[in-house]
């Protein structure tokens, strides 16, 4: 979970020791701080690692968001991906895929851990990137087996299988749906 300072409508009184925390689900342990800053923490295939986002504002309306891989023992804090105008990242449970929102659209791409930061975006060309939505998409999340990505637009929920998105995925049809 993320502990942040108050502001606008909330009181800053309980905003000490802000950061990203983990807490065991047994209810008997106290929360442990794993990062000083970040948002949207999520687990993937390794329970000793969380992924979190950090946003850097470069102007009044310009920003860059990065996805970081952080070990729970705080021994590693590495940028995995970054993109201008990206508002959210979602790592698949198996850690092999990355979905992201850029300018209200939903995209998905492979996520190899290559030792350097991947630049993501609608026009990224280092790896294949596919747009999932027609008009817009938000609230990205993965199926438990990492084979489907879910997103919403207003009150509608959409699901896209990776086999219908990329031709190189095992089980993909010869001709992908449009």
What feature does the model see in each segment?
Residues 1-21, 25, 33-40, 48, ...:
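A flexible loop/linker signature enriched in serine peptidases of the S9 family
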Residues 31, 77, 126-129:
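Tryptophan-centered short beta-strand motifs
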Residues 43-44, 91, 142:
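Residue-level recognition of a conserved intra-blade site in WD40 beta-propeller repeats
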Residues 71-73, 124-125:
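Short amphipathic beta-strand segments in non-cytosolic proteins
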Residues 123-133, 178:
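A short helix->beta-strand "capping" segment at the edge of beta-propeller domains
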Residues 136-138:
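Juxtamembrane proline-rich low-complexity "stalk" or linker regions positioned immediately after a signal peptide
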